[in-house]
Amino acid sequence: MWSDLNGLSHGRYVPARRLHEHGHHAVTTLCMNINRDILPVDGYAADVGFPDLSTVPLVETRRTGWEVDTDVVIADLEFNGEPLAIGPRNALQRAVDAWRALGYEPMLGFEMEFYVLQADPDAPGGFGPLHIPSHRVYGVGTGGDTTGLMFDLFDAAEVAELDLEGIMGEFHPGQMELNMKYGQAMDAADRAFICKDMTRELAAHKGYCITYMGRPNAAMVGSGLHINFSLVPVGGGTNAFDEAGAEYGLSSLARQCLGGLIAHHEGLAVMSAPTVNSYKRLVPGIIAGYWANWGLDNRSSTYRIPYERGAATRIENRMPCGSANPYLAAAVMLNAALLGVVDGLDCGTPQAGDGDEAPNTDRHTPHKLAEAVACLLYTSPSPRDS
Protein backbone atom coordinates (compact mmCIF):
# COMPACT_ATOMS: atom_id res chain seq x y z
CA MET A 1 0.00 0.00 0.00
CA TRP A 2 1.07 3.59 -0.56
CA SER A 3 -0.19 7.09 0.15
CA ASP A 4 -1.64 9.55 -2.32
CA LEU A 5 -1.40 13.31 -1.86
CA ASN A 6 -4.52 13.27 0.34
CA GLY A 7 -3.02 10.71 2.73
CA LEU A 8 -5.43 8.04 1.48
CA SER A 9 -4.16 4.54 0.83
CA HIS A 10 -3.93 2.66 -2.46
CA GLY A 11 -2.57 -0.80 -3.11
CA ARG A 12 -3.38 -4.32 -4.10
CA TYR A 13 -3.52 -7.80 -2.60
CA VAL A 14 -0.72 -10.15 -3.69
CA PRO A 15 0.32 -13.64 -2.58
CA ALA A 16 3.26 -13.61 -0.20
CA ARG A 17 5.46 -15.44 -2.71
CA ARG A 18 5.21 -12.42 -5.06
CA LEU A 19 5.97 -9.81 -2.45
CA HIS A 20 9.35 -8.92 -3.96
CA GLU A 21 7.89 -8.08 -7.38
CA HIS A 22 7.28 -4.50 -8.43
CA GLY A 23 3.75 -3.45 -9.29
CA HIS A 24 2.58 -1.08 -12.02
CA HIS A 25 -0.37 1.26 -11.60
CA ALA A 26 -1.64 4.40 -13.30
CA VAL A 27 0.18 7.43 -11.93
CA THR A 28 -3.19 9.19 -11.84
CA THR A 29 -3.77 7.72 -8.36
CA LEU A 30 -1.40 10.48 -7.21
CA CYS A 31 -3.23 13.16 -9.21
CA MET A 32 -6.78 12.71 -7.93
CA ASN A 33 -8.74 14.70 -5.41
CA ILE A 34 -10.95 13.01 -2.83
CA ASN A 35 -13.84 12.98 -5.35
CA ARG A 36 -11.69 10.96 -7.79
CA ASP A 37 -11.40 13.87 -10.20
CA ILE A 38 -8.12 13.63 -12.13
CA LEU A 39 -6.19 16.87 -11.73
CA PRO A 40 -4.16 18.35 -14.63
CA VAL A 41 -0.72 17.83 -13.09
CA ASP A 42 1.84 18.42 -15.84
CA GLY A 43 3.93 15.35 -16.60
CA TYR A 44 1.68 12.91 -14.77
CA ALA A 45 -1.82 13.11 -16.26
CA ALA A 46 -3.54 13.46 -19.65
CA ASP A 47 -0.67 15.46 -21.16
CA VAL A 48 1.49 12.30 -21.10
CA GLY A 49 -1.29 9.72 -21.54
CA PHE A 50 -1.74 8.62 -17.91
CA PRO A 51 1.40 6.43 -17.73
CA ASP A 52 2.33 3.89 -15.07
CA LEU A 53 4.14 4.40 -11.82
CA SER A 54 6.02 1.51 -10.23
CA THR A 55 5.42 0.32 -6.69
CA VAL A 56 8.48 -1.06 -4.91
CA PRO A 57 7.49 -3.15 -1.88
CA LEU A 58 9.68 -2.43 1.15
CA VAL A 59 9.88 -5.86 2.72
CA GLU A 60 11.36 -4.44 5.91
CA THR A 61 8.04 -2.66 6.58
CA ARG A 62 6.02 -5.89 6.54
CA ARG A 63 3.77 -6.29 9.56
CA THR A 64 0.71 -8.29 10.55
CA GLY A 65 -2.46 -6.67 9.26
CA TRP A 66 -5.96 -6.44 10.72
CA GLU A 67 -7.58 -8.59 8.02
CA VAL A 68 -7.49 -12.38 8.25
CA ASP A 69 -4.24 -13.94 6.98
CA THR A 70 -3.12 -10.62 5.54
CA ASP A 71 0.07 -8.65 6.13
CA VAL A 72 0.66 -4.99 5.33
CA VAL A 73 3.68 -3.73 3.38
CA ILE A 74 4.54 -0.13 2.50
CA ALA A 75 5.62 0.52 -1.09
CA ASP A 76 7.91 3.21 -2.43
CA LEU A 77 6.88 4.88 -5.68
CA GLU A 78 9.02 5.22 -8.81
CA PHE A 79 8.37 6.90 -12.16
CA ASN A 80 10.57 6.18 -15.17
CA GLY A 81 13.04 4.41 -12.89
CA GLU A 82 13.43 7.33 -10.48
CA PRO A 83 11.75 8.15 -7.16
CA LEU A 84 8.36 9.70 -7.94
CA ALA A 85 8.85 13.42 -7.32
CA ILE A 86 5.27 14.02 -6.18
CA GLY A 87 5.16 10.93 -3.97
CA PRO A 88 4.43 11.96 -0.35
CA ARG A 89 6.80 9.39 1.14
CA ASN A 90 9.54 10.51 -1.24
CA ALA A 91 8.99 14.11 -0.12
CA LEU A 92 9.59 13.08 3.48
CA GLN A 93 12.65 11.06 2.45
CA ARG A 94 14.17 14.16 0.83
CA ALA A 95 13.60 16.13 4.03
CA VAL A 96 15.18 13.38 6.14
CA ASP A 97 18.15 13.17 3.77
CA ALA A 98 18.68 16.94 4.03
CA TRP A 99 18.95 16.67 7.81
CA ARG A 100 21.25 13.66 7.58
CA ALA A 101 23.54 15.70 5.34
CA LEU A 102 23.96 18.02 8.33
CA GLY A 103 24.66 15.07 10.61
CA TYR A 104 21.26 14.73 12.31
CA GLU A 105 18.56 12.07 12.38
CA PRO A 106 15.01 13.49 12.69
CA MET A 107 12.83 11.81 15.31
CA LEU A 108 9.04 12.11 15.27
CA GLY A 109 6.04 11.10 17.34
CA PHE A 110 2.45 11.53 16.15
CA GLU A 111 -0.66 12.31 18.20
CA MET A 112 -3.75 11.44 16.15
CA GLU A 113 -7.20 12.77 17.01
CA PHE A 114 -10.44 11.66 15.35
CA TYR A 115 -14.19 11.38 15.90
CA VAL A 116 -16.18 8.15 16.04
CA LEU A 117 -19.60 8.70 14.44
CA GLN A 118 -22.67 6.51 14.80
CA ALA A 119 -25.33 5.72 12.21
CA ASP A 120 -28.00 8.41 12.02
CA PRO A 121 -30.32 8.46 8.99
CA ASP A 122 -31.17 12.10 9.64
CA ALA A 123 -27.54 13.30 9.71
CA PRO A 124 -25.54 14.38 6.64
CA GLY A 125 -23.90 11.30 5.15
CA GLY A 126 -25.90 9.01 7.42
CA PHE A 127 -23.61 9.40 10.45
CA GLY A 128 -23.80 11.76 13.41
CA PRO A 129 -22.06 12.43 16.74
CA LEU A 130 -21.63 9.47 19.07
CA HIS A 131 -23.92 9.60 22.10
CA ILE A 132 -21.97 9.08 25.35
CA PRO A 133 -24.09 10.33 28.28
CA SER A 134 -21.28 10.05 30.84
CA HIS A 135 -18.53 11.45 28.61
CA ARG A 136 -15.66 13.30 30.24
CA VAL A 137 -12.32 14.53 28.94
CA TYR A 138 -9.73 11.75 29.19
CA GLY A 139 -12.55 9.51 30.34
CA VAL A 140 -12.08 5.77 30.72
CA GLY A 141 -14.66 3.01 30.56
CA THR A 142 -18.08 4.32 29.53
CA GLY A 143 -16.82 7.82 30.28
CA GLY A 144 -14.75 7.69 27.10
CA ASP A 145 -16.04 4.89 24.88
CA THR A 146 -19.32 2.99 24.78
CA THR A 147 -18.52 1.16 21.54
CA GLY A 148 -15.62 -1.08 22.57
CA LEU A 149 -13.60 0.41 19.72
CA MET A 150 -10.77 1.60 21.96
CA PHE A 151 -9.85 -1.95 22.88
CA ASP A 152 -10.31 -3.22 19.32
CA LEU A 153 -8.00 -0.52 17.97
CA PHE A 154 -5.40 -1.04 20.64
CA ASP A 155 -5.37 -4.83 20.20
CA ALA A 156 -5.03 -4.55 16.41
CA ALA A 157 -2.27 -1.97 16.75
CA GLU A 158 -0.36 -4.26 19.09
CA VAL A 159 -0.58 -7.14 16.63
CA ALA A 160 0.57 -4.86 13.80
CA GLU A 161 3.43 -3.51 15.95
CA LEU A 162 2.37 0.09 15.42
CA ASP A 163 3.79 1.00 18.84
CA LEU A 164 0.86 2.82 20.38
CA GLU A 165 1.66 4.44 23.70
CA GLY A 166 -2.01 4.81 24.54
CA ILE A 167 -5.54 5.68 23.45
CA MET A 168 -8.01 7.87 25.28
CA GLY A 169 -11.20 9.85 25.04
CA GLU A 170 -10.75 13.49 24.12
CA PHE A 171 -12.72 16.72 24.55
CA HIS A 172 -16.13 15.95 23.03
CA PRO A 173 -18.16 12.70 23.00
CA GLY A 174 -16.81 10.31 20.40
CA GLN A 175 -13.51 12.13 20.01
CA MET A 176 -10.48 9.94 20.67
CA GLU A 177 -6.72 10.34 20.55
CA LEU A 178 -4.00 7.83 19.71
CA ASN A 179 -0.46 8.51 20.88
CA MET A 180 2.27 6.80 18.88
CA LYS A 181 5.74 5.92 20.10
CA TYR A 182 8.60 8.21 19.12
CA GLY A 183 10.90 6.93 16.40
CA GLN A 184 12.90 7.74 13.30
CA ALA A 185 10.91 10.05 11.05
CA MET A 186 10.07 7.65 8.23
CA ASP A 187 9.13 4.76 10.48
CA ALA A 188 6.95 7.06 12.58
CA ALA A 189 5.15 8.42 9.49
CA ASP A 190 4.66 4.91 8.06
CA ARG A 191 3.03 3.81 11.31
CA ALA A 192 0.78 6.88 11.41
CA PHE A 193 -0.31 6.31 7.80
CA ILE A 194 -1.11 2.65 8.45
CA CYS A 195 -2.87 3.48 11.70
CA LYS A 196 -5.28 5.83 9.94
CA ASP A 197 -6.36 3.05 7.59
CA MET A 198 -6.63 0.50 10.37
CA THR A 199 -8.81 2.68 12.60
CA ARG A 200 -11.25 3.56 9.83
CA GLU A 201 -11.62 -0.04 8.66
CA LEU A 202 -12.10 -1.53 12.12
CA ALA A 203 -14.74 1.08 12.93
CA ALA A 204 -16.57 0.32 9.67
CA HIS A 205 -16.64 -3.38 10.57
CA LYS A 206 -18.60 -2.47 13.71
CA GLY A 207 -21.00 -0.14 11.92
CA TYR A 208 -19.31 3.11 12.95
CA CYS A 209 -17.49 5.77 10.95
CA ILE A 210 -14.19 7.34 11.98
CA THR A 211 -13.41 10.76 10.56
CA TYR A 212 -10.12 12.64 10.76
CA MET A 213 -11.70 15.85 9.44
CA GLY A 214 -10.28 18.97 10.99
CA ARG A 215 -13.65 20.03 12.41
CA PRO A 216 -16.62 17.88 11.35
CA ASN A 217 -19.06 19.69 13.65
CA ALA A 218 -18.98 23.43 14.28
CA ALA A 219 -20.33 22.88 17.80
CA MET A 220 -17.34 20.72 18.71
CA VAL A 221 -13.58 21.23 18.85
CA GLY A 222 -11.41 20.10 15.97
CA SER A 223 -9.10 17.13 15.60
CA GLY A 224 -5.37 17.55 15.20
CA LEU A 225 -2.39 15.53 14.03
CA HIS A 226 0.20 16.91 16.42
CA ILE A 227 3.79 16.09 15.48
CA ASN A 228 6.52 15.93 18.12
CA PHE A 229 10.00 16.54 16.72
CA SER A 230 13.60 16.32 17.88
CA LEU A 231 17.04 15.51 16.46
CA VAL A 232 19.81 13.12 17.42
CA PRO A 233 23.24 12.78 15.80
CA VAL A 234 23.41 10.34 12.91
CA GLY A 235 24.87 7.12 14.25
CA GLY A 236 23.54 7.68 17.76
CA GLY A 237 23.94 10.12 20.61
CA THR A 238 21.95 12.35 22.90
CA ASN A 239 19.05 14.64 22.04
CA ALA A 240 20.47 17.62 20.14
CA PHE A 241 17.66 19.90 21.35
CA ASP A 242 18.63 19.51 25.00
CA GLU A 243 21.30 21.70 26.60
CA ALA A 244 21.50 21.84 30.36
CA GLY A 245 22.36 25.33 31.55
CA ALA A 246 21.11 27.06 28.41
CA GLU A 247 18.10 29.36 28.56
CA TYR A 248 15.01 27.18 28.93
CA GLY A 249 17.27 24.13 28.59
CA LEU A 250 17.17 24.47 24.80
CA SER A 251 20.18 24.27 22.49
CA SER A 252 20.83 26.87 19.80
CA LEU A 253 19.84 24.17 17.29
CA ALA A 254 16.41 23.87 18.91
CA ARG A 255 15.97 27.64 18.90
CA GLN A 256 16.91 27.85 15.22
CA CYS A 257 14.43 25.09 14.37
CA LEU A 258 11.74 27.02 16.21
CA GLY A 259 12.82 30.14 14.34
CA GLY A 260 12.38 28.39 11.01
CA LEU A 261 8.94 27.08 11.91
CA ILE A 262 7.79 30.52 13.01
CA ALA A 263 9.29 32.25 9.95
CA HIS A 264 7.50 29.87 7.58
CA HIS A 265 4.33 29.51 9.66
CA GLU A 266 1.89 30.66 6.98
CA GLY A 267 3.55 28.54 4.29
CA LEU A 268 3.31 25.40 6.41
CA ALA A 269 -0.48 25.61 6.49
CA VAL A 270 -1.30 24.21 3.06
CA MET A 271 0.27 20.81 3.85
CA SER A 272 -0.70 20.89 7.53
CA ALA A 273 -4.31 21.90 6.84
CA PRO A 274 -5.00 20.56 3.33
CA THR A 275 -8.80 20.81 3.06
CA VAL A 276 -11.39 23.58 3.10
CA ASN A 277 -12.74 22.16 6.37
CA SER A 278 -9.29 22.36 7.99
CA TYR A 279 -9.65 26.12 8.38
CA LYS A 280 -12.74 25.75 10.55
CA ARG A 281 -10.31 24.33 13.11
CA LEU A 282 -7.51 26.86 12.63
CA VAL A 283 -9.15 29.74 14.46
CA PRO A 284 -8.23 31.53 17.70
CA GLY A 285 -9.74 30.31 20.93
CA ILE A 286 -9.53 26.52 20.55
CA ILE A 287 -5.74 26.03 21.05
CA ALA A 288 -5.30 24.58 17.58
CA GLY A 289 -2.05 26.02 16.18
CA TYR A 290 -3.28 29.37 14.87
CA TRP A 291 -0.63 31.86 16.04
CA ALA A 292 2.95 32.05 14.72
CA ASN A 293 4.58 31.64 18.12
CA TRP A 294 6.16 29.19 20.52
CA GLY A 295 5.71 28.58 24.21
CA LEU A 296 7.00 26.67 27.20
CA ASP A 297 4.43 23.96 27.97
CA ASN A 298 1.80 26.39 26.67
CA ARG A 299 -0.97 24.90 24.53
CA SER A 300 -2.10 28.32 23.31
CA SER A 301 1.09 28.50 21.22
CA THR A 302 1.54 26.58 17.98
CA TYR A 303 5.06 25.31 18.65
CA ARG A 304 4.95 24.02 22.19
CA ILE A 305 7.98 22.89 24.19
CA PRO A 306 6.73 20.35 26.76
CA TYR A 307 8.32 20.57 30.20
CA GLU A 308 10.42 17.39 29.90
CA ARG A 309 14.13 17.78 29.21
CA GLY A 310 16.95 15.36 28.49
CA ALA A 311 16.01 12.66 25.98
CA ALA A 312 12.39 13.92 25.91
CA THR A 313 13.19 17.51 24.85
CA ARG A 314 11.08 18.19 21.78
CA ILE A 315 8.99 20.61 19.74
CA GLU A 316 5.30 19.79 19.51
CA ASN A 317 3.83 21.19 16.29
CA ARG A 318 0.13 21.73 16.98
CA MET A 319 -0.87 23.12 13.57
CA PRO A 320 -1.53 19.97 11.49
CA CYS A 321 -5.16 18.90 11.39
CA GLY A 322 -6.36 15.32 11.53
CA SER A 323 -6.86 15.16 7.77
CA ALA A 324 -3.24 16.06 7.02
CA ASN A 325 -1.07 13.57 5.16
CA PRO A 326 1.47 12.41 7.80
CA TYR A 327 4.30 12.29 5.25
CA LEU A 328 3.68 15.77 3.83
CA ALA A 329 2.95 17.46 7.16
CA ALA A 330 6.18 16.02 8.55
CA ALA A 331 8.16 16.92 5.41
CA VAL A 332 7.24 20.61 5.41
CA MET A 333 7.87 20.83 9.15
CA LEU A 334 11.36 19.33 8.81
CA ASN A 335 12.13 21.60 5.84
CA ALA A 336 11.01 24.76 7.64
CA ALA A 337 13.04 23.80 10.72
CA LEU A 338 16.08 23.15 8.53
CA LEU A 339 15.73 26.57 6.92
CA GLY A 340 15.85 28.03 10.41
CA VAL A 341 19.27 26.43 10.85
CA VAL A 342 20.52 27.32 7.36
CA ASP A 343 19.44 30.95 7.79
CA GLY A 344 20.55 31.21 11.43
CA LEU A 345 17.11 32.26 12.68
CA ASP A 346 16.23 32.64 16.35
CA CYS A 347 12.83 32.00 17.88
CA GLY A 348 12.62 35.11 20.06
CA THR A 349 10.73 35.07 23.35
CA PRO A 350 8.11 32.48 24.23
CA GLN A 351 4.41 33.17 24.51
CA ALA A 352 3.45 33.79 28.13
CA GLY A 353 0.01 33.25 29.60
CA ASP A 354 -3.13 33.05 27.48
CA GLY A 355 -2.00 33.23 23.88
CA ASP A 356 -5.51 33.88 22.60
CA GLU A 357 -6.28 36.73 24.98
CA ALA A 358 -2.85 38.34 24.59
CA PRO A 359 -0.87 36.79 21.70
CA ASN A 360 2.73 37.97 21.35
CA THR A 361 2.40 38.12 17.55
CA ASP A 362 -0.05 39.34 14.94
CA ARG A 363 0.92 36.60 12.46
CA HIS A 364 -1.29 33.54 12.13
CA THR A 365 -2.36 30.79 9.76
CA PRO A 366 -4.41 31.75 6.69
CA HIS A 367 -8.19 31.69 7.05
CA LYS A 368 -8.93 29.78 3.85
CA LEU A 369 -7.29 27.02 1.83
CA ALA A 370 -6.89 29.33 -1.19
CA GLU A 371 -5.02 31.82 1.01
CA ALA A 372 -2.79 29.01 2.29
CA VAL A 373 -1.88 28.02 -1.27
CA ALA A 374 -1.00 31.64 -2.01
CA CYS A 375 1.17 31.80 1.12
CA LEU A 376 3.11 28.77 -0.07
CA LEU A 377 4.20 30.78 -3.09
CA TYR A 378 5.92 33.29 -0.80
CA THR A 379 7.82 30.89 1.41
CA SER A 380 10.52 28.30 0.74
CA PRO A 381 8.90 24.85 0.66
CA SER A 382 12.22 22.99 0.72
CA PRO A 383 15.79 23.57 1.88
CA ARG A 384 17.79 25.90 -0.32
CA ASP A 385 20.42 24.43 -2.60
CA SER A 386 22.86 27.26 -1.97
Predicted segment positions?
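ATP/Mg2+-dependent ligation/transfer catalytic cores
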Residues: M1-G166, A188, Y208, T361-S380, ...
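A generic structural motif
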Residues: D4, E78-L84, T142, Y182-A188, ...
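Short glycine/proline-enriched loop/turn "hinge" motifs that connect secondary-structure elements
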Residues: R62-D69, E105-M107, I167-H172, M220, ...
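Short, hydrophobic beta-strand segments
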Residues: V73-F79, M176-Y182, F229
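Short, conserved phosphate-binding/catalytic loop or strand-edge motifs used
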Residues: M112-V116, E170-L178
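Active-site-proximal beta-alpha loop/turn segments in soluble metabolic enzymes
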Residues: L130-V140, P173-D187, N217-G222, T238-F241
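Loop-centered beta-sheet repeat module
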Residues: A189-K196, H205-Y212, I227
